[in-house]
Amino acid sequence: MNAIIWENNQLQLLDQTKLPRTIEYIQCTDYHTVGKAIKKLSVRGAPAIGAAAAYGLVVGAQQVDATDRKTFLEKLEAIAGELGATRPTAVNLRWALDRMMMRLSTAPEQNVEDLRKIMLEEAHAIYNEDVESNRKMGEYGQELLPEEARVLTHCNAGALATAGYGTALGVVRAAHEKGKKVHVYADETRPLLQGARLTSWEMVQEGIPVTLITDNMAGYLMSKKMVDCIVVGADRITANGDVANKIGTYGVAVLANHHNIPFYVAAPLSTIDMSLSSGEEIPIEERDPQEVTHHGGQPMAPEGVQVWNPAFDVTPNSLVKAIITERGVVLPPFAENLAKICCNKK
């Protein structure tokens, strides 16, 4: 199941808010539709929204009424700004848009139609490189898993969260393809239940054994020695190895540390933000209180109750055993080793 499809010169995004009940694609005829899809989590996961935004910029370029290069680029900068503001925490979003604009600014072509073609080629490259990166990550990461691996994961870092294959679930997939006996424990991941709705669905679709648990069962699961390792994705990793990921990840990492269970993070180099020295500098998105107070459109809490709804938390590097990338497994000290592996990233 592809979360992002470019077909017949049109972008289609799988509406993940409707999974697993309904498989429905959003037809993105303008860049505003792409921005809304990213904002409302119809497309989500750091690598996926980066690729979606790249294609969104292509859609925007189709809308731009300009005949000269200068006007064309100015209007695209404004569109990139709008798309980049939809979600502040995931660095892949801004990375993909910056890469698209850099490709345009360095292209010698003056003809607007030629520039549009260059943009589509670059968006395709971002998409295809992500799939390839995920497969490489999976290959490196599966080596960390024992032959019989019980893996706990949080949120959804699978094919749905990327251009394809997945980051954390890419590790699981690769292990499964190697013939390892993998059993996934999926945190439901409140408040939007990405683990229940998406991770469980992906695993069931592929025939990989999966057990769904509520978030507050994770500690007891670990205490019963039912978990061999934790593998999660990331929305941003800072230069020192601090990791921003879906809210609740930090708690899982603390529990893993207490129970001496390795906590691994799988993420492409595009998720690593070397401009930030630590997780304290990461902007944390706060979302609509109704995500907490309502479910399926029905209230679950008294009207008027105050709500705090950060979408992400930050796991300090001291709790991370290793970071799995497409260039290999990065071990502590992260500040030194991330700098080495990122020095040549595109």
From Swiss-Prot:
Enzyme Commission no: 5.3.1.23
Family: Belongs to the eIF-2B alpha/beta/delta subunits family. MtnA subfamily.
GO annotation terms (biological process): L-methionine salvage from methylthioadenosine
Active site residues of this protein: D235 (proton donor)
Ligand binding (substrate): R44, G45, A46, R87, Q194, N245, K246
Pathway the protein acts in: Amino-acid biosynthesis; L-methionine biosynthesis via salvage pathway; L-methionine from S-methyl-5-thio-alpha-D-ribose 1-phosphate: step 1/6
GO function terms (MF aspect): S-methyl-5-thioribose-1-phosphate isomerase activity
Site positions per UniProt: Transition state stabilizer: C155
Protein purpose: Catalyzes the interconversion of methylthioribose-1-phosphate (MTR-1-P) into methylthioribulose-1-phosphate (MTRu-1-P).
Keywords: Amino-acid biosynthesis, Isomerase, Methionine biosynthesis
Keyword Endoplasmic reticulum: no
Catalysed reaction equations from the record: 5-(methylsulfanyl)-alpha-D-ribose 1-phosphate = 5-(methylsulfanyl)-D-ribulose 1-phosphate
Source organism of the structure: Desulforamulus reducens (strain ATCC BAA-1160 / DSM 100696 / MI-1) (Desulfotomaculum reducens)
Domain of life: Bacteria
Name of the protein described by the UniProt record: Methylthioribose-1-phosphate isomerase
Pfam families cross-referenced by the UniProt entry: IF-2B
InterPro entries reported in the protein's UniProt record: IF-2B-related, IF-M1Pi, IF_2B-like_C, Initiation_fac_2B_a/b/d, M1Pi_N, NagB/RpiA_transferase-like
PANTHER family given in the database record: METHYLTHIORIBOSE-1-PHOSPHATE ISOMERASE
